[in-house]
Amino acid sequence: MNKSWLAIIFLIISNQAMTQTSHFEPQQPLQGSGAINIVVSNLDEKEGDTYFAEAEKNERNGELNEAVTLFGKAAFEYNSSKQLARYGEALMRLSNVHYQLAHFVEAEQVVLNVALKNYSKMGSRNGQMESYSQLGRIYLALNKPTQSLWFYTQQGILAKQIGNNSAFIESVLGMANVKIRKKEYSLAAKDLNRAEVLAKSANIHEFKNQIKDARSMLPAIAAAKPAKKSSKKK
């Protein structure tokens, strides 16, 4: 496991714990401390933005190990300045880079132990939905189909609740891929047909290639679309 990543996550979790315990400690009021806190918070946020931008640049250039370090630093700075939305975004990007590096356990831990808790604390259903989607992908890569299917199902439930058609179709596709892995080809074909119908009715074209690629992994019989019933009478 990447030592720099471990150090960053330890610092983030430690900072969260210090923030929580500070509520129970009696503190003496310091004159002018409010202005100092605002300045420090703004500096932390700006540092976070700088790290985040550099991390994106490294990711685009394929320098993924550097991107891991910088997204971790950005997450730490955003957490310090209580920019929870940006904190969550940095964590999700950190997890995604780990995923690209095939560091699936690290990718899982960032989302499961940190990002998902952050989004739950915020009450962000979009953030939770994104976390479920990422965990679905990660567990499929880890060959844990039961967990993967559960998280894709949770993504679909939230997507339906908030009316996000793209995320719902993505969850159906995720479930289809899990069923392909489990060799449940008939069930997978039904999910792919459902995803295709939903995408067409919502006029969403981004999943066309994904559906095509998933169908290519099905045996010929399972991949065949159901024939339309003839309306002609004998």
Residue ranges and their predicted role:
Residues 1-234:
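Intrinsically disordered, low-complexity regions
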